[in-house]
Each structure stands twice: as C-alpha cells, then as structure tokens.
Amino acid sequence: LANRQLEGTWGSHLIEVDAAGQQLRIIGQKAPVSGSSVKLTLDIHLQKAAEQALAQRRGAVVVLNVKTGAVLAMASGPSFDPNIFTRRITQAEWKRLQRQDNPFLNRALQGYPPASTFKIVTTTAGIESGKFSADSVLGTAAYISVGGHLFHEHGGGGYGTIGFRDAIAYSSNTFFYQVGLTVGPENIAKWGGRLGIGTTSNMGLEGGSRGSIPTPAEKERLFGEPWYAGDTVSTAIGQGLVQVTPLEMAVIVAAIANGGQRVQPHLFASETNTPKTRPQPTGMHQRTLETIRSGLIAVVQGGTGRQLNDGSIPLTAGKTGTAEVPGGQRNNALYVGYGPVNNPQIALAVIVENGGYGAEAAVPIAHQVFKAYFNKATSKSPLP
C-alpha cells in the first residue's frame, strides 16, 4: 500500500575493474535516498481490542471516525504474524498457515449478505422514495404470500401494525417485505449505492471486493434469469443476491450517525480532512435520519442489542443481523452501530462467519470495542 513511500531509492556505485576483477577506480556513485515516514489513521488501542475480541474467529471488525472516515481499526480473522516473512519461513510454519481458515483473506473487504443490518437501506429507500412517510404504518403477520410462496416473519408471529421505528427495533421481516415490494429493487439499489454499497473505495488494498445490490436488469445480464417478486422480498431484508463488505457496512451506519454524509474511508493520516476524503452528501432528509436513529437506539435499549446497554458504556445505537448461509451451515452473525448517541464519534461493523445470531456472537465483540474506545476517551479529548 505504501511501499513506494517507505522503501526509498537504492544507492549505487559504478566501478571500473581490470580483467582479474580488481577495482581500479570509481567512475560514479549515487547516494541512497531514505524512504518517507507514513502515519496511519489506525488507533493501536482499538486495533488490539478488535483483534482480541475477534479472537481468531473467521470474521472482521471495522471501526471508522464518523466525521472524517479515518479507519481506526480493521481486523480480520484468523490473523497471522507478518513478521515471519521478514526471514526464511519454515515448511512447518507454512503448513500451519495453510491449515488455518484462509488467514491471508482480508474479510473486512469481502462481500457478505448483510441480513437485517440492511434494513437501514430499505428504510431509507422507503421513506426517500416518497411512497412512505416517516410516520407510515403497516400490518405485520406470521408470513406473507408472494407468487405462491410464503415468506415468514423471523419470530414466528407478527408484531401487529407498526411503523419504521418499531420495525427496525423488532427487525420485522414482513414489514420490510412490504416496503421492498412497494418501492422496488431499483430504488433499494439506488439508495444502497448512495450510502456506500459498491461505491466505497478499498483504499488501494488488494484482494478485496465491493458490495452489490443487483437489479432486475443486472440479474438478467449476469445470470440470464428473470427477476421474481421473491427476489425483491429477499433483497429488502439483505438476503438473496445482496452483498455488502464490512467496510461498507461501517460507512452506511456512519452516514446515519453524522447526518447523512457518506464518508470516504482512508488509512493515511495525511489524507484526513482533505478534498480527497471529503464526505459526500447522500441526500437523505433529516426526518429519515431521525426515524432510523430512533429505531437503532431502540435496538440497544431493549432489543437484540441490549447487551450494549449494561451501563458500562455510554448509550450507543445499532442493528443486529443473522444471515443465512447455504449448505446447512450455521448462520453468519452481524452487527453495525455507532456511539455515543448524543455525540457520535465512531461507527463499527462486525461479522462472525457461522457465528449464529448477531446478538450471540457479533454484539459482544462490538461491546468490547466500544468499551475500549470509551475507556480511552475518558482520559483523552474526543476525536476531531
């Protein structure tokens, strides 16, 4: 990423020698040039906390400054010690690395189904489309029937007639099925892009991907298959063909926290608060932001994120997700959040592959990271 700045330039000597290879004289020489120092945005305290919380599980943690987009932590597990490559690596070490679950893969930059964390995007599309207001209510039920197929509520039963705030707090699938069918996949894809899905830079890091929210036209082009109403239903709750990277998840929730600005993630401190990384307006209205925030706060105050409301840290806001994985594997666990609520400073995203429920595996990791940040912040001024 920064080799050009760090490595400098080799020096050289041009020497005349005789037939025996003995030096006769120096014809010319070029002095070496030292490399430049590079300061990263990473907070070593938060980075360690994220890695320790992940505890070598397959997954990722990303923490951003909600105002500037500076990457404060980016952990991917399982990890490895890169210092072993400063010398000749032994065969045993290489075999041990190969036995692990692909430690060379930066999972912070890989696409995953975002599950219910994506309901932030669907809420935005619903209200900003004009087809719903922030005060709209819909009836929920144990399931809805679409194209002869039943799409179920995650809790088994409905939640009655509710609005967006409670739909986020309860994570009602049948509420968001209806929103998705009303606004359509194109609107969802449009607002997902504005919030950072598929439009967030990987900061020059190799081996990553970008998220995507396929539309009917793209599905036809990529797979040669028509779009079904069931595809829209799945998209609305972050399943099906939707893919989002943990970095993009953090960008989305940062935009909710900072007033609707899509931050530009970056790793070099020299890029902070420069035109290159200036946050971009998403066009979200204040009422939309307030509605989503109230739902995310409710998740922490009494919903699936209530482990974060134990009094050990200031009040935060967030959303859990539990993503289905093909092949009968255990679900992926997700969490996105920001804090503190009264003065948002950091946003984070957590995924644990095959971790089960978001509240079970991802929320405890988020709690440890938030706690590390807030404990440090009590003895240090807030982020700029």
Task: Describe the function of each predicted region.
Residues 20-59:
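Conserved, well-ordered alpha-helix/loop/beta-strand core segments that scaffold catalytic motifs
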Residues 1-35, 236, 350, 367:
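Small/polar-residue-rich segments within soluble enzyme cores
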Residues 61-66:
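Short hydrophobic alpha-helical segments used for membrane anchoring or interfacial signaling
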Residues 10, 55-59, 112:
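Short, small/polar residue-rich loop motifs at catalytic or cofactor-binding pockets
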Residues 18-25, 67-116, 121-354, 358, ...:
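Beta-lactam-recognizing serine transpeptidase/beta-lactamase-like catalytic domain environment
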